[in-house]
């Protein structure tokens, strides 16, 4: 029986016992209980906080329907939603007005062309890697692909909606999401990944291998985080780590903007930690960076319990991951006390933590394969191409890529 069902059964039983008028055969609180174990469990199953979290998990599971492992169907609704503002078609004027918001690409006669000046060459290269296999099957089209961290087209602007592709956004933006270049190359560059985090296909293998060597029973029952101080949203966890190092190991690393210990909350910068080495911990925290976190998808591969802070920033695959089903949601601005309560709840309910961790791993392993990323790119390009309502003429200021 799943751990959640056991917990719920005990909660119901305790309620029934506490409200029974028939005390025959029962050990009452004021009587000696020779046959009843003094401590049936290490956990107080009747705390209000326990009831709160169990109820949230129960509610999430009751409404959850697993998606099918075919044709990147888990993410189909995201593409439909993103393209809906352009159901009337994409005009040449719309693309021209959008040009300043990203890098211009053309597909003409199954060849790919790009404007000469790419702000982030590795990012453009990552994008082009996913476009290339689709060229033989695509109609002529023009695309404005934003390779910056930040989305571009605010939905509250009164101007015409413009078709700009971005890897990440919030609900305030109308950008069309595409799977980030970082699935192949051009992700965040740190000392451990000097050319930038990429090759999702390879990391899937290496991190899973590390996870296999750190079975749940062997993992350290600690919350873990390593990253730079891109925002103060991360401060409470780092401060909790300093106050309760037996519960949390969260430290700031140095980034390019680091000037003094103030930039790491008055502490010496910690060393960066390989993604594979995260797997030795049971609880892994994810925070947004400038936009959505490149770390997020990798954490699930450790088969550890992922605590995801904030729900504002999205990538194309985020909506398929459900809070309390695949990960533990944490509100932005959670205090040290709130974080401590949440971590301790799962430390006391180890089987429940493991069930969520397993579901998170299985979902990412089955529905965020490289073939799913390629599938999403294919569907995006084909459906976008059908919306283009003008004859695309070769722009000779662009350079041929493929």
From Swiss-Prot:
Q: Which GO terms describe its biological process?
A: positive regulation of Notch signaling pathway; protein O-linked glycosylation via serine
Biological role: Protein O-glucosyltransferase. Catalyzes the reaction that attaches glucose through an O-glycosidic linkage to a conserved serine residue found in the consensus sequence C-X-S-X-[PA]-C in epidermal growth factor-like repeats. Regulates Notch signaling by glucosylating Notch in the ER, glucosylation is required for the correct folding and cleavage of Notch.
Q: Which UniProt keywords apply?
A: Disulfide bond, Endoplasmic reticulum, Glycoprotein, Glycosyltransferase, Secreted, Signal, Transferase
GO CC annotation: what is one?
endoplasmic reticulum lumen
Name of this protein: O-glucosyltransferase rumi homolog
Q: What class of enzyme is it?
A: transferase
Pathway, per Swiss-Prot/TrEMBL? Protein modification; protein glycosylation
